[in-house]
A protein has these predicted regions:
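Non-ligating segments of multi-cofactor redox enzymes
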Residues: 1-402
């Protein structure tokens, strides 16, 4: 067992392999305040990657309604229950996770694990996790649009001074996080799961897979899925053919709400403020990882929903939720201090090309590709035009004048 540093939890932790970060790390930010659960992302992924035999139950991209929706069923409740108490300690303005990660919860002496001639017991079953039942994959829309909170009566209203709504839900779009310390890679007894050095995408070598399903057990996010027809595990491939061409993945390109930004994510000490993902995660600190306490250092980040109580969101995104929500709201209000963030939020989802650098001027936000070529321009303020109610040239009244 190696000791690796996980910056998301502020400490070193146990992991089956030594720390070895790739040259670049595939990363993403989702603004879930804008997600409408249209499932266009889900269908674009499904029709591209998982329309074969044995893949009927697979959704490498899915959108679930929180707090009650989940695919597979109760994936998050299952792993959180198994981890026990998950407390954070604040230390000089930074947060340190004091609970166990999935690699530490079973208190295994990894140096005395089973020998190489007994591969099934080498890693997977020592990582805290579970294999979902086949029925757990059968209800991808379970809990859709079901709210939590108070029951609305005829006189229920939302006052201006309420920070969150008395009744709430939100949509959580999910893909593979292509984690820095991937549970699926740590759990595979035959090392069929690997991380690409050139972009950090986590893939399964299906020719090497021996169907132990330990990657399924070891992925707490439920994103490694077994194909019973092919007798192999399969997962999101990060749309690597598109990424290699400088394009964003299918689910990003087809997102109607423009909630997704794809790019490269660096560790905090190597952050580049002109890099959109680095800026949202490290500079503005408005985008947060999903269940960082699990210990995988996931590389998909979320701007938390402003209408949801902090207690629920802290469990999901960590202790910086309140600050992230405040910063996001200030940017959306137009506070001058957050003009750069506001410009980047406008730029999200505006091009099929990967934006590697961005700039914000008084008039517009501009995105550049890896060659420094402009691939997107969006105005900071949308122009508005008001037409006369009566059109004298056509001798007609207009029904829509804005």
């Amino acid at each position: 067992m190696a000791e690796v540093y996980n910056w998301q939890i502020g400490r070193e932790m146990d992991y089956p392999y030594a720390e070895a970060r790739p040259e670049k790390q595939w990363g993403a930010v989702f603004d879930i305040n804008k997600c409408i659960a249209c499932q266009t992302c889900t269908l674009s992924c499904k029709t591209t990657w998982t329309h074969g035999e044995g893949q009927e139950h697979m959704f490498w991209n899915n959108v679930e309604t929180k707090p009650y929706g989940s695919h597979p069923i109760e994936w998050d409740k299952e792993i959180l229950d198994r981890l026990g108490v998950q407390e954070w300690r604040e230390e000089d303005g930074e947060y340190v996770y004091e609970g166990d990660t999935i690699f530490e919860a079973n208190d295994v002496d990894w140096d005395e694990m089973a020998p190489d001639d007994d591969p099934q017991n080498r890693h997977g079953q020592d990582i805290e996790g579970y294999i979902p039942d086949s029925e757990d994959w059968a209800h991808p829309n379970l809990g859709e649009d079901e709210p939590a909170g108070e029951t609305f009566e005829s006189d229920t209203h939302i006052s201006e001074d309420e920070e969150t709504h008395p009744m709430w839900f939100f949509y959580l779009p999910r893909v593979c996080n292509h984690c820095s310390f991937a549970g699926c890679a740590g759990g595979c007894p035959v090392q069929a799961v690997y991380k690409r050095q050139e972009d950090g995408i986590v893939l399964i070598d299906e020719d090497s897979c021996e169907a132990f399903q330990e990657c399924v057990r070891a992925c707490p996010y439920g994103k490694s899925v077994y194909n019973p027809e092919e007798s192999v595990s399969q997962k999101c491939v990060g749309c690597y053919p598109k990424v290699e061409e400088g394009l964003v993945p299918q689910c990003f390109e087809n997102c109607l709400g423009k909630i997704r930004q794809h790019g490269w994510i660096n560790p905090p000490d190597e952050a580049d403020s002109s890099n959109p993902i680095d800026y949202l995660v490290h500079d503005a600190e408005v985008a947060l990882p999903l269940y960082p306490q699990l210990g995988l250092e996931p590389n998909v980040y979320y701007i938390p929903p402003i209408n949801v109580p902090d207690d629920y969101l802290i469990q999901m995104f960590g202790p910086r939720v309140a600050d992230a929500k405040e910063t996001y709201q200030a940017a959306r209000r137009g506070d001058e201090e957050y003009r750069k963030l506001r410009g980047l939020l406008h730029l999200m989802g505006s091009t099929e090309w990967r934006v590697e650098e961005f700039d914000v001027t008084d008039e517009e936000a501009i995105g550049y590709d890896e060659d420094g070529e402009t691939v997107a321009r969006v105005p900071m303020e949308e122009p508005q035009y008001e037409r006369e109610r009566f059109d004298e040239d056509n001798n007609a009244y207009r029904l829509d004048i804005t």
